[in-house]
Amino acid sequence: MHPENRDTNMKRIGEYRKLLGVDQSATLKDLKTVYRNTMKDAHPDKFVNDEAGKADAEEKSKSVIEAYHFLVSINPETQEKYKEEYTETITQSIIQDFYLEKSILKVQHFNGKMYEYIGVPRNTYIKMVNADSPSRFARRHIYGNFIYR
């Protein structure tokens, strides 16, 4: 993985964890508890006659929601829950389409499943574009090498 892409994506994950006040060992239950408590404190409806406070709360709420959903999607418990489905997709369904957006490789399979691989360097993506079989390339160089959701 290219160091700057890895750093950018790891920084994003770190910022999300910091926002929610959790570390990488947080369970789904921990994430849910922190999310609910944070949303209670930052919910825009708490700021009835305070437009500035309401606007700040809306921004914080959006950030908290984004962080929560992202961290849940990469959590080991979530990945374990969907491991069988993921394994079946990457071994039995060929790639229909794929594209790179801000070092996130989005891969659409013919079975309708889409996965995002975080921190994929542009040069790896270009090699995948030029590969005879993007599915085989992904099995060898993408799957198992990058955080996915």
Which ranges hold each PLM region?
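Short amphipathic alpha-helical molecular recognition features
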Residues: 14, 23, 53-56, 117
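Acidic (E/D-rich), amphipathic helical modules within compact regulatory domains
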Residues: 37-73
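Short "pre-J" leader segments immediately N-terminal to J/J-like domains in DnaJ-family
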Residues: 1-14, 24, 59-72, 79, ...
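Accessory regions outside conserved functional cores
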Residues: 85-149
